[in-house]
Amino acid sequence: MPTNKTRKLFLAITIAALSTGLAFQRPQTPPPSRDLELSVRGDMFAGFAGDSAALDRAMNACEDALARDPKDAPALVWHATGIYFRSGVAFRSGDIATGTQLLAQARKEMDEGVALRPDGVEVLIPRATVLQSQAAHIPDPETARRVLQVSTNDFEKILKLQADDFANLPLHSRGELLGGLAEGWNGLGDTEKARAYLTRITKELPKTPYAEKAAAALAANSLPRPMGITCIGCHVNYNKK
């Protein structure tokens, strides 16, 4: 059974981004299929909340999709997200060997998914979000920095892909993306870039919780880590498909 700390890690960060990630997408021709996401989302999120049977169903659905097409990028990324969760459970139970093995497998699958669809926001968002979360829990500073750099680069690419339509995206999507960038650059030690994104939040998202938190961070003598800019107003219905 996942600990409260494990559940908070994935519910507060991974679920928030994955459940809103497709709202970041620009129109594509043809648009990416959401069939898999719609079929596994409820079970995956319920699994992150502690329902192991639901997580098993979601993982089996991903594995069935990959059996049909090993290059199904969304299936790879969703499957990898579940494996990341299982790796965290293993680590916290003291099974370091299994946790390490699962962590490596998850990163491999997630990277493969992004390589197959490098401009697919539906695969970039999960990797960016999960890696930002992972980096915050890596004890080795250099390893954490490398992981966080990949995450932040993904967020930058997502912003570039969304540039033409950014103002029309939902408030939550804009806030989470700009907040993710501010958190990423702050974690990497580039406070100038972090402050630039915080300032952008205050200007483009005025009178919102994102702007309030960004303004508070900017007013501090030094930027806190983390700043708590992301995962604002997230609500998940695990049974909604």
Report the location of each language-model feature.
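Flexible helix-coil transition and linker loops at the boundaries of alpha-helical arrays
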Residues: 29-30, 63-76, 111-123, 157-172
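Short, flexible, mixed-charge glycine/proline-rich loop motifs
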Residues: 219-227
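Boundary/linker segments of alpha-helical solenoid repeat arrays
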Residues: 121-122, 159-171, 203-216, 239-241
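The canonical Cys-X-X-Cys-His
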Residues: 227-239
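Short coil/linker segments at helix-helix boundaries
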Residues: 37-60, 81-119, 129-164, 175-176
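Bacterial Sec-dependent signal peptides at the C-terminal "C-region" and cleavage site
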Residues: 13-32
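Bacterial N-terminal signal peptides that target proteins for export
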Residues: 2-13
